[in-house]
Design a protein with these regions (language model features):
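Hydrophobic alpha-helical transmembrane segments of multi-pass integral membrane proteins
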Residues: 1-191
Length: 191
């Protein structure tokens, strides 16, 4: 496909061939997520949204390659914020609690009670951020595709709210870690 980019008359084919693996990856991942035996949690919802946005951005990029005007920003927003942003949030909500739990586990050496991973960041707060993120993806896509003050303001507010909730949740995990470490340090040492 990269050789076709050098030939202007075939660049549309190169773009279509480039979008095909991304779309196939999105469809396959959505299928695997649906077949998973593990219960779906909020981070799985971020992954589902991300894969749906990857599929839609592939379609939008293919339409741009075929000469449909005005979809460039839509393809970019769906890919960068809808796909990459959603997966980043979904992964952060798995990785950060695990790392906090792992470090506390090593520090405690089984002498102290430590919070489990579900207690490090509350599922309810993750769900609040998910709702803000879910609202911000289509609002941002619409606001950048059809610029209007009436669309831009709600998009900006929902994007800001979503990111503030993400920051709040990650800061809460840091606070939980620090308070657990402080409790371990303050505990009397047994001989």
């Amino acid at each position: 496909a990269s050789v076709l980019l050098l030939l202007p008359e075939w660049s549309w084919l190169a773009a279509l061939l480039s979008a095909l693996p991304a779309a196939a990856f999105a469809v396959l991942t959505l299928k695997l997520l649906r077949q998973s035996r593990r219960g779906a949690d909020v981070s799985t919802a971020f992954w589902r949204l991300g894969m749906a946005c990857l599929l839609l951005s592939s379609l939008a990029a293919s339409a741009v390659a075929l000469g449909v005007p005005g979809l460039e920003l839509l393809a970019g927003v769906l890919f960068l914020y809808g796909f990459a942003g959603s997966l980043t949030c979904g992964m952060l909500y798995k990785i950060v609690p695990f790392l906090v739990w792992l470090h506390l586990q090593r520090l405690s050496q089984r002498r102290f009670a430590i919070p489990n991973m579900k207690q490090i960041i509350s599922e309810g707060w993750i769900r609040y951020q998910w709702r803000g993120h879910l609202a911000s993806v289509p609002l941002l896509a619409l606001a950048l595709s059809w610029p209007s003050r009436w669309l831009l303001l709600p998009a900006a507010v929902s994007l800001m709210l979503s990111q503030l909730l993400l920051a709040r949740n990650l800061c809460y995990a840091v606070r939980r870690y620090r308070s657990a470490v402080a409790a371990m340090a303050a505990a009397p040492v047994s001989a």
